[in-house]
Amino acid sequence: MKILVTGGAGFIGSNFLHYETSAYPNDKFVCLDALTYAGNYNNIKSLEEKENFEFVKGDITDREFVDKLFEKENFDLVINFAAESHVDNSIKNPGVFIQTNIAGTQVLMDAARKYGNIRYHQVSTDEVYGDLPLDRPDLKFTEETPIHTSSPYSSSKAGADLLVMAYYRTFGLPVTISRCSNNYGPYQFPEKLIPVVISRALNDETIPVYGKGENIRDWIHVHDHNIGVDMIVRHGKVGEVYNLGGHSERTNLELVKIILKQLNKPEDLIRFVTDRPGHDLRYAIDSSKVERELGWNRTYTFEEGIKETIDWYVNNQDWINDIKSGEYKESYQRSLKK
């Protein structure tokens, strides 16, 4: 099987490719990534040595480029990880999110229709459901929870999800959607909460926490998320949505304190800052559908996963420093000269 993985140089996509290229040596994986600021060629550089991996630099919004790639490669499956994903950036510049997350999805699905009605999977987020009250721990998002977005980011992902299901119903494109809770693990771009806290704490810098730190997130290790995506694309029912959650709810303040404790750093590094506009209160995912129908279950407890993640960042500070310095942006160009 030949599989197109878009956004494969990003955090979740690169972890997916590291797993898949080893787990399925007889499948061919083509990674398409525009290498925008959060796409890091260093995340997948080691995969270039594998016979079942190929990297292609390109933008999913470039219709002519995407069509030529589909015509050349004859894909059997498309998995779309490509997305602008940082909520704060979406508040500052929503247009970029609309273009990549919605228009890019349309370009990919049009190509999938044109070149053989190719199986298509959309990687989405629990943020399309909006948020839950802090005082109702019994409530969780199910696949039937109505879409009720809060930010330009989540709205762009919801728009893409609606478009995916419209292509299924109107054109018969064989699609699935996965919606995950907050991912954590290696290779996460250091603009997101966990790598920000680790990086700043290692340098004894203050740790900004929105509001009072009471907002709750459900955390899933990126490997567990990607195992779920793998099960869905290979065994899931076409036309269905599947939630993937980590069963690991923590307040943002609890999470920061856990990281500081493991790093032996003082809690007085914490600084409470003005809350994010429209900040979602609580996310919690009900994963019972994918557990029941496909046999998926998480393999990491939060305690195991966060310790391993912290250790990875401690042992890979050069990776973070390359990003901070901008050096990572040159890695792909250097690879072309070899």
Give the role of each language-model region:
Residues T105-Q106, A158-M165, P195-I198, N226-I227, ...:
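Conserved active-site helix of classical SDR/Rossmann-fold NAD(P)-dependent CH-OH oxidoreductases
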Residues N89, P186, G246:
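Short, conserved catalytic or interaction motifs in soluble domains
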Residues F16, S22, F29, G39, ...:
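C-terminal substrate-binding subdomain of Rossmann-fold SDR/epimerase-dehydratase oxidoreductases
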Residues N40-N43, N93, G104, F189-L193, ...:
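Residues at alpha-helix caps and immediate loop-helix transition turns in enzyme cores, especially N-
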